[in-house]
Each structure stands twice: as structure tokens, then as C-alpha cells.
């Protein structure tokens, strides 16, 4: 049995932000959300988040019924933060996994290894360590041949010989709670910062073993915007390597960004300057980009999207989007459609083999199959108070520069003459002409000049 405690009380002054550090976004999710997600496969019995600075904002940002919040009203160090758990874990006999809310790159497999080592060896505590190329500023961990911790020395207290040891304390711990609970009340703040350090408890609980994480990038903490950018680069490299090894082609990977919540199938091609975000799913054979943004959208097989923005929308197989199209607000586009340049779809549903080739706006509309929307057609969906829907039947065609004033329904096989402003429903198999008759006045320029 394991309880997880996540330290999320700090302000993060080096971020120079009013937003609590743990709520800053990394690849579409906050730092602390990434930490929480990493422990979910461990099936912890409880998930305790220790909050302090802007506590209510952090709670609001982490709305989940599975989380419990513990307040550290005054931030007096990591040891003091864990002391706040004493009344919440009274009588608990299992293990406590302690994580930092600003260390977002930890893999679940690393935490599983830490827990397994802890439980197999019946340790009082097990700590995560790593070997850094440049360990300056980190406490050094000294172990015997069996990885039993002998000593933890802060960087400022290291001798020249001790500084040659590059094994550092990552600040990730697993404790036998009974042992830790006995030590916590006796921690002292005998340091320049007058804080209570959890590392002081590590040396007092009993046998402590270290587990080394091979990829030191996993334990990198976020303290400023530069480190946040570095973490994003690491995350992107992981994600893009994963998809390329799974059969996805990335042309110029350095110019592409992909959230780790995106799902791609083999033989998808992503071109330069393309960004895939949120819960996007793209099926096999689709080609996205260059210069496109796809967010929270589902794209079928063999879809192409060029220089376009697609958010919160669904596109079926074989449809071509762009260049310079904008789909948003739960647009749903059928199979083998064409959405061309400078077309915007908002909360609109199009049937199969429907074309909106250029310079059109369809908002709050439904169109059937094999519809052709002429250049410059718009749905006037807003009357100044609320929005109304436009319904367009199968095989209907609108001429260039048509305005469909909602609420309005066009039946099947309707033809809308170019330049028409349609304000009333049109029955099936009809031609609608809604424009002023053309008038020609011969000799107009000469006569106007004489006057």
C-alpha cells in the first residue's frame, strides 16, 4: 500500500509570475498535473497535494475527486511540509512516496523501480539519485557497494574530494511511514534558512537505499522560464522519437511540436511548422502541414491539411483542408470533402463529398451530401441577440456572393443564384433568385457629363 504526497506549496519566485509555479503549463498540462499523471499507474490508495502559496488557485486548477489537499500555511521547508501530513495519516502502516510538483519529467517506470526496490529490501527509506555532468548546487549521496546510503552532504559542505562524486539527491523519496512519523516531530531548523529539511529525516529513519535513475533529465526541476523551456525541449524529443519509431514521418522535426496526449497512426506525415495539441487523433495516410495547427480534433485516414487551423473539430476520410482554412467550434466535415482557401467553418456539419472551395463562412449550419458552396457564400447566423441555424439539403448549390440569412432552410437540389440574399425557406428542386434586377442606362456617362 502506498500513499503519494506531492509538494506544491512553493511560490516559485524565479518564475516572476503571479501564477503558482506548479500551475505553469508544459506541453498542454500543468507541471503538477504531469506529476500526478505519472503516479496514476501505481494505483496509490491516497493522493495528497500539499498546497500553500495561492492554495485556492492550485485547488481550482486541480479539480479531481481523487485528490486531497493539505495546507502548509507557512512554507518552512520540505520537512515542515511533510509534518503537515501527521494528522492526516494517523494510524497508517504503509509507504509514503514523496514527489515534487515542479519535477514533471519523471517516468512511471522510474517510480515503479523505486517502489519495488523499497519494498523488496524492506527499507526504512529509499531515495532516487542520479549522476549529473555538472552537479554544482546539489547535495552529494555517498553509498556503499550495496547502494546503502552512508552519507548525504550538501554541496556547500563538500570537500574537494567529495565534490568529485557526481551522484546527487534527486529529492524523490519513498518512506516507511511508521519510521518517518516518529522522526518528523523532532526535526530541527539548524541552518541559515531556518527551514526543516526532509533530508535530515532520511538519515534518522533506519536503513536507506539509493536507486539511480539512468536518464538524469527525468529529475530536472523547474525554477525559471529557461528551465521550463529546457523541459519542453526534452519532452518534445521524447514524444517525436516515440512517433517516428512507430512509423510516423516528421519532416524537419525541430520545427514541429506534438503534445504527448496526441495519437497518431503509422504512415501519417507531418510537415514543417506544424503543431499538434490536446486530444488530437490522426489516422493513417493523412498529411498535415506545412504551417498547420490541429488542436483537440479527430482526423480520419488520408486527410490533408495545408496552412490551416483546426480546433475542436472532426474530419472524415479523404477530405482536403486548406490552404488558409479555419475550422472551429465542433465543425464536422464528412468524407471526401474539399474545404478550400479562406474558408471558415464554425459549429457546422457537412455531409460527404461537399465542397466549400473558397472565401466562405458557414456558421451554425448543416449541409447535406454533394453540396457545392460558391465563392463568397456566407451564413448570416447572428441577429444581434442570438445565433440561428442554416440548413442546406443534398446536392444544393449556392452561387458566388450569396448570403443565407438564418434561420433558413434550403431543400434538396436547390440552386441559389449568384448575388442572392436568401431570407425565406426554399423548397426542393427550386431556383431562388433574391437580388435586384439589373438595370442598364445607355449613354449614362455622356448625359451625366452634360449636366
Swiss-Prot record:
Read off the InterPro entries from this record: Bifunctional_GlmU, GlmU-like, GlmU_C_LbH, Hexapep, MobA-like_NTP_Trfase, Nucleotide-diphossugar_trans, Trimer_LpxA-like_sf
> Listed GO molecular functions?
glucosamine-1-phosphate N-acetyltransferase activity; magnesium ion binding; structural constituent of carboxysome shell; UDP-N-acetylglucosamine diphosphorylase activity
Question: For the region N-acetyltransferase, what residue ranges are annotated?
Answer: 247-451
Which residue stretches belong to region Linker?
226-246
Would you say which domain of life the source belongs to? Bacteria
Binding locations of Mg(2+): 102, 223
Q: Does the keyword Acyltransferase apply?
A: yes
The residues responsible for catalysis, as annotated, are 358
Q: Where in the cell is it found?
A: Cytoplasm
Reaction catalysed?
Answer: alpha-D-glucosamine 1-phosphate + acetyl-CoA = N-acetyl-alpha-D-glucosamine 1-phosphate + CoA + H(+); N-acetyl-alpha-D-glucosamine 1-phosphate + UTP + H(+) = UDP-N-acetyl-alpha-D-glucosamine + diphosphate
Query: What are its cofactors?
Result: Mg(2+)
* Keywords per UniProt: Acyltransferase, Cell shape, Cell wall biogenesis/degradation, Cytoplasm, Magnesium, Metal-binding, Multifunctional enzyme, Nucleotidyltransferase, Peptidoglycan synthesis, Repeat, Transferase
Q: Where does UDP-N-acetyl-alpha-D-glucosamine bind?
A: 7-10, 21, 72, 77-78, 139, 154, 169, 223, 328, 346, 361, 372
Q: Name one GO biological process term.
A: regulation of cell shape
Example GO CC term: the record gives: membrane
This entry's comment on the bound cofactor is: Binds 1 Mg(2+) ion per subunit.
The record's EC number reads 2.7.7.23, 2.3.1.157
Q: Which residues bind acetyl-CoA?
A: 375, 381-382, 400, 418, 435
Pathway listed: Nucleotide-sugar biosynthesis; UDP-N-acetyl-alpha-D-glucosamine biosynthesis; N-acetyl-alpha-D-glucosamine 1-phosphate from alpha-D-glucosamine 6-phosphate (route II): step 2/2; Nucleotide-sugar biosynthesis; UDP-N-acetyl-alpha-D-glucosamine biosynthesis; UDP-N-acetyl-alpha-D-glucosamine from N-acetyl-alpha-D-glucosamine 1-phosphate: step 1/1; Bacterial outer membrane biogenesis; LPS lipid A biosynthesis
Chain intervals for the UniProt region annotation (Pyrophosphorylase): 1-225
Q: How does it assemble?
A: Homotrimer.
* NCBIfam families linked to this entry: glmU (TIGR01173), PRK14360.1 (NF010940)
Family (UniProt): In the N-terminal section; belongs to the N-acetylglucosamine-1-phosphate uridyltransferase family.
| Role description | Catalyzes the last two sequential reactions in the de novo biosynthetic pathway for UDP-N-acetylglucosamine (UDP-GlcNAc). The C-terminal domain catalyzes the transfer of acetyl group from acetyl coenzyme A to glucosamine-1-phosphate (GlcN-1-P) to produce N-acetylglucosamine-1-phosphate (GlcNAc-1-P), which is converted into UDP-GlcNAc by the transfer of uridine 5-monophosphate (from uridine 5-triphosphate), a reaction catalyzed by the N-terminal domain.
> What name is this protein filed under?
Bifunctional protein GlmU
State the taxonomy lineage.
Answer: Bacteria, Bacillati, Cyanobacteriota, Cyanophyceae, Nostocales
Q: Which gene encodes it?
A: glmU
Amino acid at each position: 500500500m502506498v500513499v503519494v504526497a506531492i509538494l506544491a506549496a512553493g511560490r516559485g519566485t524565479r518564475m516572476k509570475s503571479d501564477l503558482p509555479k506548479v500551475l505553469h503549463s508544459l506541453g498542454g498540462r500543468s507541471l503538477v498535473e504531469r506529476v500526478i499523471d505519472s503516479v496514476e499507474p501505481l494505483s496509490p490508495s491516497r493522493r495528497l497535494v500539499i498546497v500553500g502559496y495561492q492554495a485556492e488557485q492550485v485547488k481550482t486548477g486541480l479539480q479531481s475527486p481523487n485528490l486531497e489537499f493539505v495546507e502548509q500555511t507557512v512554507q518552512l521547508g520540505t520537512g515542515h511540509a511533510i509534518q503537515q501530513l501527521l494528522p492526516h495519516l494517523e494510524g497508517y502502516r504503509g509507504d509514503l512516496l514523496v514527489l515534487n510538483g515542479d519535477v514533471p519529467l519523471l517516468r512511471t517506470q522510474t517510480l515503479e523501480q523505486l517502489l519495488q526496490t523499497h519494498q523488496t529490501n524492506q527499507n526504512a527509506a529509499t531515495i532516487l539519485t542520479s549522476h549529473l555532468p555538472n552537479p554544482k548546487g546539489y547535495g552529494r549521496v555517498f553509498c556503499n557497494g550495496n547502494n546503502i546510503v552512508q552519507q548525504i552532504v550538501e554541496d556547500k559542505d563538500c570537500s574537494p574530494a567529495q565534490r568529485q562524486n557526481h551522484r546527487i539527491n534527486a529529492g524523490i523519496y519513498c518512506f516507511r511511514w511508521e519510521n518517518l512519523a516518529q522522526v518528523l516531530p523532532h526535526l530541527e531548523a539548524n541552518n541559515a534558512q531556518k527551514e526543516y529539511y526532509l533530508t535530515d529525516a532520511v538519515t534518522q529513519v533506519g536503513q536507506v537505499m539509493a536507486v539511480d535513475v539512468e536518464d538524469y533529465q527525468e529529475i530536472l526541476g523547474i525554477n525559471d522560464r529557461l528551465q521550463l523551456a529546457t523541459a519542453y525541449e526534452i519532452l518534445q524529443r521524447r514524444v517525436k522519437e516515440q512517433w517516428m519509431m512507430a512509423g510516423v514521418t516528421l519532416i524537419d522535426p525541430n520545427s514541429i511540436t506534438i503534445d504527448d496526449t496526441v495519437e497518431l497512426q503509422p504512415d501519417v506525415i507531418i510537415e514543417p511548422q506544424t503543431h499538434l495539441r490536446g486530444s488530437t487523433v490522426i489516422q493513417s495516410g493523412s498529411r498535415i502541414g506545412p504551417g498547420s495547427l490541429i488542436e483537440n480534433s479527430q482526423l480520419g485516414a488520408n486527410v490533408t491539411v495545408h496552412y490551416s487551423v483546426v480546433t475542436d473539430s472532426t474530419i472524415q476520410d479523404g477530405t482536403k483542408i486548406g490552404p488558409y482554412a479555419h475550422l472551429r467550434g465542433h465543425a464536422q466535415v464528412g468524407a471526401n470533402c474539399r474545404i478550400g482557401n479562406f474558408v471558415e467553418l464554425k459549429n457546422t456539419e457537412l455531409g460527404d463529398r461537399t465542397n466549400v472551395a473558397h472565401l466562405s463562412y458557414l456558421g451554425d449550419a448543416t449541409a447535406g451530401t454533394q453540396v457545392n458552396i460558391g465563392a463568397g457564400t456566407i451564413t448570416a447566423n447572428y441577429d444581434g441577440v442570438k445565433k440561428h441555424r442554416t440548413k442546406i439539403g443534398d446536392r444544393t448549390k449556392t452561387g458566388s456572393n450569396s448570403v443565407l440569412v438564418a434561420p433558413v432552410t434550403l431543400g434538396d437540389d436547390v440552386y441559389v443564384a449568384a448575388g442572392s440574399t436568401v431570407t425565406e425557406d426554399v423548397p426542393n428542386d427550386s431556383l431562388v433568385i433574391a437580388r435586384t434586377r439589373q438595370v442598364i442606362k445607355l449613354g449614362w456617362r455622356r448625359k451625366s457629363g452634360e449636366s
